[in-house]
Swiss-Prot record:
Annotated protein name in UniProt: Large ribosomal subunit protein uL3
Complexes and interactors: Part of the 50S ribosomal subunit. Forms a cluster with proteins L14 and L19.
Listed GO CC annotations: cytosolic large ribosomal subunit
Gene Ontology molecular function terms on file: rRNA binding; structural constituent of ribosome
Role: One of the primary rRNA binding proteins, it binds directly near the 3'-end of the 23S rRNA, where it nucleates assembly of the 50S subunit.
Post-translational modification remark: Methylated by PrmB.
Organism for this UniProt entry: Mesorhizobium japonicum (strain LMG 29417 / CECT 9101 / MAFF 303099)
Underlying gene: rplC
A single BP term in Gene Ontology: translation
């Protein structure tokens, strides 16, 4: 089981495939996604990696989190999340995961917080049909009608579809397709919609119900470290 990644939702657009068909895609961007900490079987009782993404101002980061990031020798992160991994897919602290972690055609599960809609009625929230427009109907055109039973059971069952708060919930969409990736700009293009508003952080994992492609990198696609070579000096004659 590989680690997932954290990406920011940029928005939606469309691209054209080789057959000339337009494909609606959601654009996700990875911003310096690094491993911040490890969870091991010996110390924590399970194996996982903690990832951090984006950049946060030091003044807006708590003292405890500043120390946490300093231990990993990484800059303060805007978003931190943990992903369960198998022992053979553990990633070193400080390593940066790139968008090449996923391959075109791969199925993934995406998790995000849906856009909040506030308090909504049953027609918008549950797609009910509403009441009659006329013929004796007054002020009950968009209501849900009766909600209870009679003396037995004498209550409204839990889970009854009624008006209430809509949206702003954590949702996972399974088996969405990776259309393509752009390593230079750090972009992931996913077919269809992804829960969340523009600018929201999205968790992207390998699909739980579909086999991992054989060409997917393991344990992850890691950006190679840039070596700062010292400038050559002229030897003394």
């Amino acid at each position: 089981m590989r680690s997932g990644v954290i990406a920011k939702k940029v928005g939606m657009t469309r691209i054209y495939n080789d057959a000339g068909e337009h494909v609606p895609v959601t654009v996700l961007q990875m911003e310096n996604c690094q491993v911040v900490a490890q969870r091991t079987q010996e110390k924590n009782g399970y194996t996982a990696v903690q990832l951090g993404v984006g950049l946060a101002k030091v003044k807006n980061t708590s003292k405890a989190m500043r120390g946490h990031f300093a231990t990993a020798s990484v800059e303060p992160k805007a978003k931190v999340a943990e992903f369960r991994v198998s022992a053979d897919n553990m990633i070193d602290v400080g390593a940066e995961i790139t968008v090449e972690h996923f391959v075109a055609g791969q199925k993934v599960d995406v998790t995000g917080t849906t856009i909040g809609k506030g308090f909504q009625g049953v027609i918008k929230r549950h797609h009910m049909g509403g009441g009659r427009a006329t013929h004796g109907n007054s002020v009950s055109h968009r209501t849900h009608g009766s909600t209870g039973q009679r003396q037995d059971p004498g209550k409204v069952f839990k889970g009854k579809k009624m008006a209430g708060h809509m949206g702003d919930t954590r949702v996972t969409t399974q088996n969405v397709e990776i259309v393509s990736t752009d390593a230079d700009r750090g972009l992931i293009l996913i077919r269809g919609a992804v829960p969340g508003s523009k600018g929201a952080w999205i968790l992207v994992r390998d699909a739980a119900k579909v086999a991992l492609p054989a060409n997917a990198p393991k344990p992850a696609a890691i950006r190679a470290a840039v070596k700062n070579e010292a400038p050559a000096t002229e030897g003394a004659e």
